[in-house]
Amino acid sequence: FFAIFARMNKAIFALCAFLFSIFTLQATAKDWNAVNIPMVHLQDARRYVCDPENIMSAAMRDATDAYIGRLEKEAGIQAVFVIVSHVENGDPFRVAQDIGNKYGVGNKKTDRGLVIVVAIDDRKYFIAPGDGLEGDLTDVECDDIARSCIAKNMRKGNPDMAMLSTAKAIYNKFKTGETGIESPKEG
């Protein structure tokens, strides 16, 4: 009887320790916002993906940076992509707006800036085009790109492809007029 009781106590202790570690990790997870996300493009003009937690592989981050760099050089669109675990208040829309306002993403005259925020553990994202892009990149196109590139790849657990395919689709949109993705099926 005492041996069974001792094993149960060990199992209960192990379960309690496991649950405590999960809650501790969640409590210490950083809530990212426009103030504490390092803006890599301010230190290196060839970098556009803000990935302070190193969620993406270096090679895929470089490939994504290359597409965004081409977007700026060929179409005059400055873009900032952010990928983090959590954003403040679970609100990527607010974080994207705050980044655009705080750092002035895009040319001041044309307002052709773009901020994309992906918060993996919050399971949320937002594509925020500047006012100067809204005629060229509609809300419907932003939603199609987000669902086909970000949501689809995040469901597969592939943040690298979520960011790279988004950069490719947006680059294609401004280079050819088409995103190169099929519009997601309704329903």
Show which residues each predicted segment covers.
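Classical eukaryotic N-terminal signal peptides for Sec-dependent ER targeting/secretion
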Residues: 9-11
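Bacterial N-terminal signal peptides
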Residues: 14-22
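Folded, non-transmembrane soluble domains that reside on the lumenal/extracytoplasmic side of membranes
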Residues: 29-187
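Short, positively charged and aromatic/hydrophobic N-terminal segments
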Residues: 4-7
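Hydrophobic membrane-targeting alpha-helices
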Residues: 23-28
